[in-house]
Amino acid sequence: MRPMQLDMLSEMDDAGSSMAMDVDDLEAMEILNEGGLVSDNKLADADFFNKFDDDFDDTDIN
């Protein structure tokens, strides 16, 4: 016998009610939104890959 759809939804609601909340996630998002850490972290290879010329035909895009 297959479980009814209502039974499966009620089980999902019960499982989420007991989970703990992480407070640190909010603080990390606030720091990233302010731009304090985003501008400081630059990939080491970013300049290397930007040195290559674009050889794609962009006429069909515009």
Swiss-Prot record:
Expressed in roots, flowers, siliques, stems, leaves and seeds. In flowers, detected in petals, anthers and pistils. Keywords: Auxin signaling pathway. Disruption phenotype: No visible phenotype, except a longer hypocotyl in light-grown seedlings. GO terms for biological process: auxin-activated signaling pathway; epigenetic regulation of gene expression; response to auxin. The F/D-rich region (45-62) is necessary but not sufficient for SMAP1 function. Interacts with the COP9 signalosome. Mediates responses to the synthetic auxin 2,4-dichlorophenoxyacetic acid (2,4-D). Not involved in the response to indole-3-acetic acid (IAA). Interacts with RUB modification-related components and may regulate the cullin-ring ubiquitin E3 ligase complex (CRL) activity. This is Small acidic protein 1. The gene is SMAP1.
